[in-house]
Every structure is written in C-alpha cells, then in structure tokens.
Curated annotation (Swiss-Prot):
Gene3D superfamilies: 1.10.40.90, 2.40.40.20, RNA polymerase II, clamp domain, RNA polymerase Rpb1, domain 3. Its EC number is 2.7.7.6. The gene is rpoC1. This is DNA-directed RNA polymerase subunit beta'. Zn(2+) binds at C69, C71, C87, C90.
Amino acid sequence: MIDRYKHQQLRIGSVSPQQISAWATKILPNGEIVGEVTKPYTFHYKTNKPEKDGLFCERIFGPIKSGICACGNYRVIGDEKEDPKFCEQCGVEFVDSRIRRYQMGYIKLACPVTHVWYLKRLPSYIANLLDKPLKELEGLVYCDIESYPNFSFARPITKKPTFLRLRGLFEYEIQSWKYSIPLFFTTKGFDTFRNREIYTGAGAIREQLADLDLRIIIENSLVEWEELGEEGHTGNEWEDRKVGRRKDFLVRRVELAKHFIQSNIDPQWMVWCLLPVLPPELRPIIRIDGGKLMSSDISELYRKVIYRNNTLTDLLRTSKSTPGELVMCQEKLVQEAVDTLLDNGIRGQPMRDGHNKVYKSFSDVIEGKEGRFRETLLGKRVDYSGRSVIVVGPSLSLHRCGLPREIAIELFQTFVIRGLIRQHLASNIGVAKSKIREKEPIVWEILQEVMQGHPVLLNRAPTLHRLGIQAFQPVLVEGRAICLHPLVCKGFHADFDGDQMDFKVPLSLEAQVEARLLMFSHMNLLSPAIGDPISVPTQDMLIGLYVLTSGNHRGICVNRYNPCNRRNYQNQKRSDNSYYKYTKEPFFSNSYDAIGAYRQKRINLDSPLWLRWRLDQRVIASRETPIEVHYESLGTFYEIYGHYLIVRSLKKKILFIYIRTTVGHIALYREIEEAIQGFSRAYSYAT
C-alpha cells in the first residue's frame, strides 16, 4: 500500500468486510459485479478449463493467457481501438494474465467465523478484550454445550417486552436457563425469538465485540489496576500471585485497546463474514506426467470451506424443517474448515489428505525460514549477488574490499559482455561469453574498468543496525574469499573465524548515489546510536600493533654484549669454523633507507637500529650520563646512551643525533605523521 506521503509500505492487520469486498469485487464493462466464489470446483475434467465461479474462474481472477478469453477469442491488450474490452459470451476481460497474481476473490460465509489467530493464539486478543476465559469463548464458538453454553443473549433491539428484559428483572441468574433454552430450538415460533435475542457461535462473539467501547475499557482497567495497587500485599502468597496476574492482564488489555484505537481497527473485524480468496497464481495447479493435475493444499482447504459453507446455506434456506442443533453443528464445521485453512493443527490433530500427509495451511506458507516473507520477499535470492567467507585484507584501504576473480567475473558478467561488444572485441553475446570462459587478458582489463564504476554492498546477517550493510569499492584478489579491512569488522559484528558475508551490486543510479554518499565505509566511522567511534582496532589489529612496536626492551647493554642473541642481529655462519660473526647495529640517515633495508630482508622487523634524528628535537636528559664513549681518529667521538647516540666534534659540538628504534616503530610513526598532516591540510582547506 501507499500512504499519503507516497511511501510504499506493508501493514498486516485486521480489515473491514467492506475493504475485503473492495479488494475482491470488480465491475465488468456490462455492469455485472463479480468476485464471489460460490463453487468448489477448479478445472473441468474434459476441457481442462477453469470452472465458472470456481476457485480458478477467469471472470473473477482474469484470463490464464494474456488477451485470450475463455472462449478462445483474442484482443490486443492496451489497444483503445479494440472494442469491446471483454468477451460478452464468457465475461472474461482482455487483460494481462499477470492480474491472476494479485486479483483476489471472496467467499460469502453463511455464518460469522472467528479468526483463529485472534482466538487461539496466546495471548488471545478476543479473550483479553471481552475479559472472559478462553475456554468459555471456545465453547461458545465451537458449540460445546457440555462445558459452556453455546449461545449468548443479545441486547434488546425493541422497547417491547422481551425475554432478555424479563430475565433482567430477576435478582439472580437462573443457571438452569442455559440448559433449558436449547430444548426449545425445535419448537414452532422459536425462530423469531432466536433471531431476535439469541446468537450462537461466532455471531455471539461478534455482537459482544460490537458492544465494546474501547475508551471505557481503558478507563475501567486503569481504575481497577489502581485499586489493586492500593490494596498492597495480603500476606497470602496465592492471593498475591492472583492479584499480580490480574494486574498484568489489565496492562495487556489497556495496551491492546490502545493499539486498536491508534490503528483505527474495529474489534468486531476479528470475526469474518467474508473470507478472502488468494489469487490463483499464489496457489497454482501444476500439471504432472500423464496429464494429471496436482493442486496446492491451500486450494484443497478452500474447497472444504466452500463445500461446508454451501451445505450450511442450503440448511438455512430450509430452516423451518431443519433442527436447530443440526444448523449449529454445520456452523461448527464451517468454523473448523476456516481454522484449518488459516492454521492447520492449532486446535489439536491436524487435518490430513488421503495419503496421510498434513495439509499445508496459510500459516505454514508464510511462517518460518521457508515461508513467503523470509524466503521470497525479505531474504530471497536475487541476481547480481553472491556469498563467501571473509578474510583479512591488511593492504586494503578502508573503503575497499577484495572480490575473488571467480566471483567478480560472474557478478559483473553482463557489464563485461557489454564492454566487449562496445569496444568491438566481440561481435555478439556468444562470442563475448566464449572470451570470458577462456579468461583472455582483455577480459580482466575490462572487468577492472567496470568495477571502478560500480560499488558493492556487503551485508552480514543478522543485520541488527544500519552499519550491518555498507558499501565498498571492489578490487580483484586471488583465492575464493572476500578480503575485508579489519577496521570495519566492528560495524558488522564480524571476525575472521569463518564468518560469511553476502554482497550485492546496486544497479539503479539512485542506489549507486546512495551507496557512494551515505553507505561507504569511510563515511560511517561513528556509531549512529551513541556517537562513539565504530572503526577502532580490535583483535588482529591489536596483536599486529603489539608485534610492530614490541622490539627488544632488554636494553642496549644486554643486546650489545650478548652474542647469542641471533634474532636481533644478523649472525652469519662462516664457512671456516662454527662460531657466529657478530654484526653491529646498523646506522640509517632516514626512515626510507631503514624500510628499504627491511624490504630487502637485510634486517628484521624488530631488529634494533640507529636512525638519524633532527637536531631541533632534543632527546637528551639533563643528568643522564653516557654508557660508552667511542673516539675516532679525527677527533670526533660518540656518546652512547640507553636509547640514543650523539656524535660530537673535537670542540664538543653536536654533529648528529641517532635514536635507537626498530623498523616497526618507524612504520607506525610514519603512518601517524601522514595522518596528522592529512588532517591538518583538510582543516586548513575547510577554514
């Protein structure tokens, strides 16, 4: 449905009989009103065509083939010159056959029927609103005279003396009435009394719901709740629990009444007079081998409802000669048939077919993982999507993700085909697919061009908040797993222990704009709930930062005078003997040389080294004394401290300063420095 703000939405709830009639009823061009399903038949056994006024009637639900009526005549759809727009012989409109996916019908019930979801599901909405025990209402609905009366007195509709007015004159209720009154159901003249003052079955429930004033219910419930609260504890545990349960019931009753008022729902709509019939394409008949037809369970349950409803209609037409108990039994059968259609097995033993197989009711069709909502509407499989395991991609940018080549070529295959044809590298789709199967080099070049203009959406179930689905710029990677930056894992509540994520390609221009402007991962650095940073180092990143900056903290003395420390120094085994050659800690004039030496595997990540420091950034402590002093032949000397080294001239002027560090510290420092400089430039541009 579409609201007044033109927002498409889906709302599930009770509807009025007028709304059901408006959905299912249509007026043909000749003025005939159709929509009511009166026959339990499906297809004729000789012609294999839908029966008129049956569950697959073409007059009610539309033609099976677009533009072809039941007689076989053909008209062009949408052509205004074609006249008439429906067949005068069979009454079928010349419209698109897709109308059979959404055109509904209805069954006019011979007696009111309660909706089993509102009666039997816990908590029972009908029992809560009427403030009556559920068993009493079930005895009324299902005509169980042994436990509860199967009738209810109606309010007086005239000012004349009635049995109900006479009953109200008595001070006490005569309990024997509810057993003696049904004995008069077969007497002459009782039909007038029954129709005027007595309701049975679901009709009694509907009248009681129609008499309710929801606002008065709210006021009375609040007053009673306050009175129970003022009484306090009685000291009797049983009584206190009883009072607590009553207070909880009053709260639920108030909330339910408020919901009905806010959603503008009349409580009597929980009792049906018109039963909606689903479109035939949602309960199809399939032709199997041998020419046999296999019907869906929903259609079979509809047939049972129509059979029993037609039987009740015939009994009511001959009500003068039909015993009242027989009518009530048939009303019970209609109620049970509708209950089975909506929720098979809710009242106990489910109904089965001839092969002892349980019928699949409407509740079974829509609920669960394989139901209509979760499988077909909400979580259905769509094109341009896939799923794979996620692994860490440490070399990726925050807004990028790595797609395996095998997945990417299938995901963007249509775009690659279009690119091959546009660049005249393939004459048709078949040739383009052949090039893709052979994995020619030009295919990967076009694929990379296509991926640059198409972001992908990554989602990890369950999507509990907005950051559960984010946009990324895809890049090609080897393997079969999706590579993801570890900083974005917290938003997805994901880790790299086998988690899977699905990805989709936004196709429309609006979706791509939304992905780039609102959903990119580098645009969602803060939690939308509390504003705290969401992209923070966790797990693998924390371990990596620790390893990167761990180094060797045992001090210069231990490292320098421990020749057995083979990891932190390059100890090379000589060919002439078995001892290890000791190599001094290397000196580097800048950080680029140090990182270059690490990439050439001349030093390790945590190997101590001396890095030249700027003279304007002093690291000398005021009272610190050097550990060693080395003198050169030209007069210069080195003052070696715990974590730095000073080179002085003959006149004790500081020439150079070296700090003792590792490649890991240098790499982290450079990343922080670049980030600060980038932030400073962005801030200067903004101001």
